[in-house]
From Swiss-Prot:
GO cellular component: cytoplasm; exodeoxyribonuclease VII complex
Annotated catalysed reactions: Exonucleolytic cleavage in either 5'- to 3'- or 3'- to 5'-direction to yield nucleoside 5'-phosphates
Organism: Synechococcus sp. (strain CC9902)
GO biological process, one term: DNA catabolic process
Protein name, as recorded: Exodeoxyribonuclease 7 large subunit
Length: 387
């Protein structure tokens, strides 16, 4: 190659040319997966080294973006950086300008385990401290993003299950570095629980990646939840998602809708239960009335048997029977049938001819009077011998 065809640059020109090539040949934005090393803030800007173990590159978050980050990386964190290249022509240096930094799943899980272990050691995470939920809460405080599909589902479920409970909706941010904001809301609500008649708290968020749910692993937030004066129910993400907030709550539900189901009784089931109880009460009352009626009848019958009037009636009946018997045996009844009663002068009743002699005077008593007669002949019966 001839010398006149070889380009000649000054250092500044060369660096500028390199910068132009980078601008034309590289994406204006990209995702970079890396591990953070030696992060430090200088003059309000966050400087850090991004490495994958085999190579490294400098990175920076300008102060204007740093305040907007939802996550502040620490040394050793795995991250995904949304960035673009910055080339400084004066020194021919390349830096990744981070527009956003998100924790990698491994970082989220590592921080989760660290917080969980600390809170377990202190007894903050302890199933034994969980409080039971009110059966029919007067007021439920719903902390979630507004508007959101999660809130819409919760309100619909509340109306369907138990419309008598007042639902107090309190908007909160649910993603990013918002733990401090949620804590402030919780503290204000804790001070007004009595005034607002709040019986329970539902902390809810719809689905998202595990990284999106990282705010609910915040240690300070979870300590605040554990100290809340009313039972706390969480419905964060989906069934497979688990956060530290779920572990410190009094009840963990798989979804926001499931959280409402856990807090509120079912109106239809309650109605059926009430009807069943009413029927059982009617049956019991009816049985007791019938039992007491039978007892009353038995006692009434017993009293009848033991009453003076009943006794007098029994004596009267007995007297009547004896009177009838005496009447049946009375001589007058025999006289009425045509028979006669014979007696001697001494008034002694004569039962046979053996005590009568010829010439004796005999009185014959008949039904309508008496006859005095003298005995002329005595004729004993043939089967009796004469003395």
């Amino acid at each position: 190659m001839s010398a006149d065809r070889v380009p000649t640059y000054s250092v500044g020109e060369l660096n500028t040319a390199i910068g132009s090539l980078l601008e034309r040949g590289f994406a204006p934005r990209f995702l970079l997966e890396a591990t953070v090393s030696r992060p430090q803030v200088k003059k309000g800007h966050l400087w850090l080294t991004l490495t994958d173990g085999t190579a490294s590159i400098s990175g920076v978050v300008w102060a204007s973006r740093l305040a907007q980050l939802s996550y502040r990386p620490t040394d050793g964190d795995g991250v995904t950086v949304v960035g673009k290249l910055n080339f400084w022509a004066a020194r021919a240096s390349i830096t990744v300008q981070a527009l956003d930094i998100r924790p990698s799943l491994s970082t989220v899980l590592r921080q989760f385990e660290q917080v969980r272990q600390r809170l377990e050691d202190e007894g903050v995470i302890n199933p034994g401290r969980q409080r039971s939920l009110p059966s029919q809460p007067a007021t439920l405080a719903l902390l979630t993003s507004v508007p959101s599909s999660a809130l819409a589902d919760m309100l619909r479920t509340g109306r369907e299950r138990w419309p008598m409970t007042r639902l107090l909706v309190i908007p909160i941010p649910v993603q990013g570095a918002v733990a401090d904001q949620i804590i402030k809301v919780l503290n204000r609500l804790a001070e007004r629980c009595e005034a607002l008649a709040v019986d329970g708290l539902v902390l809810a968020r719809g689905g998202g990646s595990r990284e999106d749910l990282a705010v609910f692993d915040d240690e300070a937030l979870c300590r605040c939840l554990a100290q809340f004066p009313r039972p706390v129910v969480t419905g964060i993400g989906h069934e497979d998602d688990l956060t530290i907030a779920d572990l410190v709550a009094d009840h963990r539900a798989a979804t926001p809708t499931a959280a409402m189901v856990a807090c509120l009784p079912d109106r239809d089931s309650a109605k059926r239960n009430l009807q069943d109880r009413r029927q059982r009460m009617k049956d019991v009352v009816g049985w007791r009335i019938e039992r007491d009626r039978q007892r009353l009848n038995d006692r009434r019958a017993f009293l009848r048997q033991q009453s003076p009037l009943r006794r007098l009636q029994q004596l009267q009946d007995d007297l009547n029977r004896k009177r009838d018997l005496l009447r049946a045996l009375s001589p007058s009844r025999w006289l009425q049938r045509g028979l006669a009663l014979l007696s001697n002068d001494a008034g002694e009743t004569l039962s046979g001819v053996t005590s009568i002699k010829v010439g004796d005077r005999v009185v014959i008593q008949m039904n309508d009077g008496e006859l005095d007669t003298d005995v002329k002949v005595v004729r004993p019966s043939s089967h009796q011998s004469m003395s």
